[in-house]
Amino acid sequence: MKRTLTIAVTGLNATDNPGPGVAVIRAIRDACPDCRIVGLAYETLDPGNYMPGIADHTYLLPYPSVGAEALSDRLFAIHALTPIDVLIPTLDAELPIWVRLRDLLAANGIATFLPEADALALRNKDHLHELTALGVSVPDSLVLTDPANIPKIADELGYPVVVKGRFYDAYVAQTPHDVAHWFHKLANAWGLPVIIQKFVPGTEFDVVCLGDGDGGLIGSVAMRKMQLTDKGKAWGGVTVSDKKLDAFVRDTIRILSWRGPCELEVMRGDDGKLYLIEINPRFPAWVYLSVGAGRNLPWAAVQLALGEPVAPMPPAAAGVMFLRHSRDEILSLADFAALTVHGELHRAPIPEPDDAAAVGVPQAAKVTTHATFPTEFPA
């Protein structure tokens, strides 16, 4: 009997600054309704942990900051209980560890489709300017580790500038005082360095891409934001068709020999030039738009991870919209308690041993967190 394909996905936070995991899972389920989905969460309160039709099994992971050994030990314990065929990480902060663990994962039967370490390092915000020498237009930037160097910004970049965190968040600064404010906020949130990038006035485009690792582009969907949250995240958008943008995306993927998913943030400046503002090394939270546009890139990533051939797709057509919304998810406190206390939540039967791959890894202790909230009080 053929074993059910099991795909693990991280990034199940679905707030006003959502992770991509829920959208990636929705895309995979559209292509493979019978696939088993394992949700990997870093927080018990991530809404994707409890949303119906998302994960069959949800497990807590330790934060990437604890190191590769703790993260891999936990994953292999999960793998022993619910064998995983493909892992799709969706968060910036975890990518470097999963890239380092790729060979170990493969040796234990877990396939991935991730960028090479050197390409991942080059897309870091503090190294992105190096792409200029390779032929990609990138705004000038400074790497700031000491607020004492803020006065240099006026001479080297001029104002306004964009102040960016190491992993997430970006704010426009008009003055040195603004830079100092955002520097401390971002350093406290994400650590050093903080990146100061020259502000480019113009029109922003976001492009989700899937590279084959040999310089080829499997597929892409370009989008222009129509609604924004106060964090600048897309709450609505529409696909666009632009041959110059398509060529820019293909050239960037070719220069990087990018392997796996990514999101390119591109600015068409008022001067008519295209500038690469940022590369996010994973699917964006709006990736379900790719399904609506007829380019199911998450499923293509699963196929590539499994070694299956995937033909390159033409750019998506213009005029497909998405609108994000929020809703209240109702759940039992027992589900929250199961994930909080035991580190796992199951909505489907755990696979029988004869439905599992022999991974040769002992079942480790479950992640245990703090006790749940009291709901009944004495009179």
Predicted regions and their residues:
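ATP-binding N-terminal substructure of ATP-dependent carboxylate-amine bond-forming enzymes
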Residues: M1-F113, E376-F377
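Short glycine-enriched loops at secondary-structure junctions
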Residues: A41-D46, D92-E94, D118, G213-G216, ...
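Short, charged, surface-exposed secondary-structure boundary motifs
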Residues: A68-D73, L114, L120-D126, V172-Q174, ...
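Active-site nucleotide/adenylate-binding loops and adjacent lid/helix of ATP-dependent enzymes
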Residues: D118-P201, D212-G216, K243
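ATP-dependent carboxylate/phosphate-activation module, predominantly the ATP-grasp catalytic core
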Residues: H177, H181-K185, G191, Q197-S257, ...
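Conserved protein kinase catalytic/activation segment
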Residues: K273-L274
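Peripheral (often C-terminal) accessory segments that flank ATP-dependent C-N-forming ligase machineries
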Residues: W299-A379
